[in-house]
Amino acid sequence: MDTRVIAVLFVAIMVLSSTNALPKQKGSYKNMNHADFLKGLDRASSKRDCRDSHWSCFFQSNYEDICSTAQAEECALSCGLCE
């Protein structure tokens, strides 16, 4: 191929990608804005902190059925694990 053809193709691809004409991947971390990413981290860490503070409830029940175990249900609901 001629170098001019390659250059034109390269410029065309760059223009299309900058104007959002090319399809983007859905569900990619690249499409997530920074605020949503930080909210997800905050939610995960707050659930982990809550679980750590109620560790005795979680320790006494099986993790798989934590939302149906009466002993751990209050802790799980307060931590937002059984939404």
From Swiss-Prot:
Residues 1-21 form the signal peptide. GO terms for biological process: neuropeptide signaling pathway. Residues 50-83 form the ShKT domain. The keyword Oxidoreductase does not apply. Disulfide bonds join C50-C82, C57-C75, C67-C79. Expressed in various neurons (ectodermal sensory cells) (in planulae and primary polyps). Not expressed in nematocytes. Residues 22-48 form a propeptide. It comes from the Eukaryota. Contains 3 disulfide bonds. Keywords: Cleavage on pair of basic residues, Disulfide bond, Neuropeptide, Signal. Probable neuropeptide. This is Protein ShK-like4. It comes from Nematostella vectensis (Starlet sea anemone).
